Amino acid sequence: MDNLEVKATETESVAEDRVIQARGVWHRPNVTGEETNLEGICSVLDTLQKTGVNLVFLETFYHGMTVYRSSLIPYYTGFDKFDYSPYPDYLSAFVAEATKRGIEVHAWVEDFYIGVDENYFTKYLSQWLMLTKDGAIRQSEGQEYGGYLFLDPANPEVRQYLVNFYHELLTKFPDIAGLNLDYIRYPVSSRYDDTGYTEVAMNGFAEEKGFAFPENATREEKVAMVAERYNDWVNYRAGRVTAFVGQVYDMVRTQHAGVLLSTAVFPEQGKSFGDKKQDFNTWLARGYLDIITPMAYYDDIGSLKNALEGMLPGLSACYCYAGISPTYHNLSNERVLQQMQTTKDTGADGFVFFGSQSILNAPGYIELLEQQFQQETAPALLPHADVQKLIEATAANVEKMLTQAGEPAEKVQSLLQQLQTLSADADDRDVQKMQQVQKQLRLLVRYNLGNFVTEDNLELAKEPLEQLLRYISVKADRLANKTDPGEETPEPDVPATQPEQQPTEPQQTQPADPKPANLARTLGLGAAIAAVAATCAACIHAIRKGRKKK
């Protein structure tokens, strides 16, 4: 790691005047090796807290296993040997201790990817596995590890089983505030190394497109008939992923009101749709997502800026917490701060570091982030916090800035009175009240602010109020959508088949990191490909210790 001695004063603090901001991290349980007991969990959380983190996407379903004692999914290999007393398991301990520290926890779940080793699903539910064009369960993606294993998104039983698992998870852990869907896609593939050719998928596709396979058709004949309709086949598979997102949304909306649904996606819609069958624009249009976490894993600032600016115009009813990876790629302190600042400058509502190990294992980065946020009198609020808290925090910040700028006291108090009136009228649960507050704040910011602030300080007051308007507008639009969800999730699903064998801990040991840093393949920009490929080559030894997420 270079340039770890850069002083915080050499780069403007990204925390300046930002009292509302998501500062998140994706965290794999025990990624540093110290979370084998409660003391280790507390140590990790204390470090994250002092680096300004207010949101943790905690890896909860990965390699086909989980980190709590579920009735549907096996407990992760080795965790039964750890003692988290007085808590019964890792997840119980982490969520409780994070909540004590004011850190919000969302469950990060890897929907269809189930690892590289034989496991519970391959042993007891092999009929649910994704098949390539040639009928293999090993995908071309992840060939360096023998090929990834995926569940089949086109299988209604797969989708329902996962929905049932997420319902169990959210029921057992009411303090988990959100569900972050990762691997919400098919394996990376193209026309020439295609995948998804299960009997369920091919039969469903034929039915949807209105053609029939010949009686006694062989698998090869069915594959050929499907493959010759390639564009429709891409659309069909993307539709199955969208159906799953809709099912999860419906479950959360009807049974876990208040839980936030988010997805980790690549920012390039064209490649995401064609290569991964990931149609996030439709998810946004249907109002499924409360938060989107675009994985903008670029090293250079220009590419990061372009990626975020390309997405943000379509996110009027969805928070954007931008995924960045400067610490994972061992970038300089200056570049880390630049990336954090770029997320703010482009209009993102916050940032999420991938991944926690690249901070927890680097004292220089810990010191850098601690310096950035040490002057704060209180941790930053999350943009999706209660509306009264958002208004109160904004009012206090505006008062501080205007007073320091010499704004007359009577002007400041007049503006604060306007904000207090808005706070009294707001209610996160009442769509009409939220829309009225949205309207009044818009009038104040866009047309009437000059009545309460002198011209010299107009822009100073306007920036935090515009941010507040953004957060309240998302809330109002989300609330309206959940009150009247519009288009229903397509196609009904059947109850999941329950295997005869209940989940037990697999005997195989999963690698610490079965996933390669595959940014060069997925980012899709020529210049970025070369740069990222070089970074990946340099990091290849470290990958097994700190997984590069999809």
Provide a role label for each language-model segment:
Residues V19-H27, T32-E35, H106-F173:
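Active-site-adjacent "subsite" loops/lids of carbohydrate-active enzymes
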Residues W26-E35, I73-Y87, Y145-Q160, R229-V241, ...:
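The substrate-binding groove and active-site-proximal loops of carbohydrate-active enzymes
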Residues G40-T66, P174, L289:
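Catalytic domains of carbohydrate-active enzymes, especially glycoside hydrolases
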Residues T51-Y87:
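Aromatic-lined carbohydrate-binding/catalytic grooves of carbohydrate-active enzymes
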Residues K133-T282, R286:
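Polysaccharide-binding and catalytic clefts of secreted carbohydrate-active enzymes
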Residues Y288-L304, M311, Y321-S414, Q418-Q420, ...:
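Substrate-binding cleft of secreted/luminal carbohydrate-active enzymes
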Residues P485-A520:
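C-terminal low-complexity, Ser/Thr- and acidic/Pro-rich disordered "stalk" regions positioned immediately N-terminal
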Residues A533-K550:
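C-terminal membrane-anchoring or membrane-association module
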